[in-house]
Amino acid sequence: VNLYFHYQYVPEPLTPVKGVRKLDAAHLLTVDVENWRIEEKKYWRMEDAPPLDGEPGELIREKLEEVSELIVRSDVPVGVALSGGLDSSVVAAFAARRQNSLCAFSVGYAGRPDCDEREDAAALARHLKLPFHEIELDVRTIVDFFPQLNYWRDDPVADIAGFGYYAVMKLARERGVPVLLQGQGGDELFWGYPQLRDAARETHLKAALLDSPLSQALRQALTLRLPYYRSEQTVSSWARDLAGLRSGWRGVRRRRENPARMIFYDLSPDFAAAAARMRNFYGRNFVEQINERDASEIFTFPGGWSPVETTLTKLICDTYLRENGIAQGDRLGMASSVEMRLPLVDYKFVETVVGLRKRHSDSTLPPKFWLRQAVKDVLPEWVLNRPKRGFAPPTRRWHDALFAAYGESLRDGYLVESEVLNRESAARLAEGEFPPEATSPLSFKALVLEQWCRQMRRVIPAI
């Protein structure tokens, strides 16, 4: 649960239920029924991909061609979840060349705010000659569906974008399409997240500067930056950060901390808020039961963390992609009996990217440079060169509405009853505080966990 408040999900194979864990990814569990001997064996590791020589764009293109041929094989209709982003556009373009009956699905928001990408998705669908279906989410639907969504996720995941994932898959099923292709994995494999690129840069600096004079560290860190996205929230955060000077100073201090710790999730304002505040929010007995291990142990490597880029790729795939991305999407798809297929996380495709990364550094190249090179003759320029906006629904509007409807449940709810939260802090969280720099604030994480616990108690009364 402590990890949940840091990451917004419980990193696999751990679970929020004491004494219960999942079978880890890429593991085989065998049970000998003669003597009931149980054995777990890992059968694949990303980091074991052999180094690969060659031109990255060409080799990635070859693997995309192979994967796209396999991914559309089906005896039922196949669709694609399409946003305005590069990853889903790549999946749609390659699948459309091999599946004549492919159709596209997208989600938008009432009032068409700036974050609504339906027009971009529809434009690409027209370009690819794909039938296009859309669904619009309004605040009332979000509020009414909130408890059920948390139940269908199976695990607590404080991702407000989950409403959109579910809506698209439900729409596909209603249109008679039980298989949906998605672009998950592109951001994780090709440095699509600014925070991940920053982590690579800062980890390289940490390795170089651990034994360097402070003056040299300051010269490296205190540089001005432009905002990553053209959005009101991003530009506002950039201004509060004094164009990178504040975060640069924090980086100097971070690099001189635990030498075994990579720079990774600790760049997230949400992670930092949990590290600074959650122990004061927990009940006394709960604090005493928390394992003394730090939440950053996931990205701490006493034996060393080289090579940096490969290790970071594995970390983001083992954490955010696995639980917040793949697992959440799969469960919300199954809620509508829709099979989710993810060509960009095909293991041979992943091995190609990681193998190339062992020979060619790419974290300092423009975001998704290799992927853009691979598809430059497949997608139109207006898709390839579109600035990344970052997928986000109208978060604040939904957040405020959810707390107006359910916030009071935190004051004397399951989390207070079980002493996960102390009563005073639960009352503060019930107000729905949303700091300007937050993506998934502590208040929303608490609300999701409270509703998840209530749903679990409803179906399993003994909890």
Region roles according to the model:
Residues 33-34, 45-290, 331-378, 395-396, ...:
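ATP-dependent adenylate-handling active sites, centered on carboxylate activation for C-N bond formation
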